[in-house]
UniProtKB/Swiss-Prot annotation:
<feature type="binding site">
    <location>
        <begin position="45"/>
        <end position="46"/>
    </location>
    <ligand>
        <name>3-methyl-2-oxobutanoate</name>
    </ligand>
</feature>
<protein>
    <recommendedName>
        <fullName>3-methyl-2-oxobutanoate hydroxymethyltransferase</fullName>
        <ecNumber>2.1.2.11</ecNumber>
    </recommendedName>
</protein>
<feature type="binding site">
    <location>
        <position position="45"/>
    </location>
    <ligand>
        <name>Mg(2+)</name>
    </ligand>
</feature>
<dbReference type="InterPro" id="IPR015813">
    <property type="entry name" value="Pyrv/PenolPyrv_kinase-like_dom"/>
</dbReference>
<feature type="binding site">
    <location>
        <position position="114"/>
    </location>
    <ligand>
        <name>Mg(2+)</name>
    </ligand>
</feature>
<dbReference type="GO" id="GO:0015940">
    <property type="term" value="P:pantothenate biosynthetic process"/>
</dbReference>
<dbReference type="Pfam" id="PF02548">
    <property type="entry name" value="Pantoate_transf"/>
</dbReference>
<keyword id="KW-0963">Cytoplasm</keyword>
<dbReference type="GO" id="GO:0005737">
    <property type="term" value="C:cytoplasm"/>
</dbReference>
<dbReference type="GO" id="GO:0000287">
    <property type="term" value="F:magnesium ion binding"/>
</dbReference>
<feature type="active site" description="Proton acceptor">
    <location>
        <position position="181"/>
    </location>
</feature>
<dbReference type="InterPro" id="IPR003700">
    <property type="entry name" value="Pantoate_hydroxy_MeTrfase"/>
</dbReference>
<keyword id="KW-0808">Transferase</keyword>
<keyword id="KW-0566">Pantothenate biosynthesis</keyword>
<comment type="subunit">
    <text>Homodecamer; pentamer of dimers.</text>
</comment>
<feature type="binding site">
    <location>
        <position position="84"/>
    </location>
    <ligand>
        <name>Mg(2+)</name>
    </ligand>
</feature>
<feature type="binding site">
    <location>
        <position position="84"/>
    </location>
    <ligand>
        <name>3-methyl-2-oxobutanoate</name>
    </ligand>
</feature>
Amino acid sequence: MKKTNIYDLYKLKEQNKKFASITAYDATFANLFFKKGIRTILVGDSLGMTIQGHSSTVPVKIDEMMYHTKCVRRGAPSCLIISDLPFMSYNNINDALNNSKKLIQSGANIVKLEGGLWVSDIIHELNTRSIPVCGHIGLTPQSINMQGSYKIQGRNNNDAIRLMEEAISIEESGAKLLVLECIIQKLSNNITKKLNIPTIGIGSGKKTDGQILVMQDVLGITIEGKIPSFSKNFTKNKFGIEKAIELYIEEVENELFPSENHSFN
């Protein structure tokens, strides 16, 4: 099957067609997701919580991201794979270049990093060296120790202005994609319309170009059985894994998910 590339997502944006993405951390699930129609997989540092059992993503190391990226690439050779640069692995340009190289050589097509205006120079340097970058603004889990808790973003005017400025700066720096996390849907819609690059939302309403969810949330296998309010357990009606993934893709492509119940205003 033809490999998915970044510009396939650009075509979908131009055609106003939504696409579903999901996290994966091993070859078996990556292969299953690919066979069911997922074309974009995120090897997320969320593995710190979902796989390793930590309370945040902060403890995750670059070697662990490399290991899981290799596993996912073996299971889904034709998927577009985005891999997270973990906490403090891109604190300066040299670290960002070295660690991005490691992820690309491990099988990633794109590296993802969290942050606003301060990451623009890093994105520019990576882009000029042919390393595709996905930005990530709004709720940034690596900043949990600064934020104190996982809060909805963009509810006041100053925050909304800041997030729009960050999105524009990240695009101008050369990022190819942008994740919008837990941003009120009116603002995420405005950002999506403003940018030429595709946006991928999580907890940011249905008008982003794509959606991303953590696989454990989709399959209802989270620790203590709790999932975020913006997510959905697609096995709730006693569907098996394959049917749940098919339903997730179908609801995203038809703009049935996320519903108002999974969005913030």
